[in-house]
Amino acid sequence: MDEIADKGRYTDEELEEFKALIEEKLSIAKDQLQFYRQQLADLADNPDSKIRGLDDGTGTAENEQLYQLASRQQKLIQHLENALIRVHNKTYGICRVTGKLISKERLRAVPHATLSMEAKKAR
């Protein structure tokens, strides 16, 4: 951890590693969003063929769940795109509260993180 404290930012090589990880996660997230949108479109075009329970509430619940999943996925995509901007600006991995580097382990688990664990726990 001392190595992290001594550095002001990640090296260009480290940033490239994170960029590749973010781009991979971004591609997956966009594919999932497209899937959710297609499911919503299918339900809108032909609600009777996809799901029909004992009442019309089943279709509405499924529609709402898909909408929430799509919305959450859109937020993830925005966070990942913002992370790519930070990589480009060479500010990626710097905690927005403490100004210290976020650990590589945390960034690998949550590549769009903007808070170190120290700052997150303090919230």
Role assignments for model-derived ranges:
Residues E105-A109:
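Short Cys/His-rich "knuckle" micro-motifs
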